[in-house]
């Protein structure tokens, strides 16, 4: 399946592909 977003992203970037840091500071599916 697709990787799950949800890691914190205080630096503004997400390590998980297809995820964006919005709403900050939590990564969500782009």
UniProtKB/Swiss-Prot annotation:
Post-translational modification: This is a cyclic peptide.
Keyword Disulfide bond: yes
Coiled-coil intervals: none
Alphabetical UniProt keywords: Disulfide bond, Knottin, Plant defense
Cross-link (Cyclopeptide (Gly-Asn)): 1-30
Gene Ontology biological process terms in this record: defense response
Disulfide bonds: 5-19, 9-21, 14-27
Known function: Probably participates in a plant defense mechanism.
Domain notes: The presence of a 'disulfide through disulfide knot' structurally defines this protein as a knottin.
Protein family (similarity comment): Belongs to the cyclotide family. Moebius subfamily.
Name recorded for this polypeptide: Cycloviolacin-H3
């Amino acid at each position: 399946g697709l990787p799950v977003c949800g890691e914190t992203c205080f630096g503004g970037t997400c390590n998980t592909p297809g995820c964006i840091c919005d709403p900050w500071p939590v990564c969500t599916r782009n």
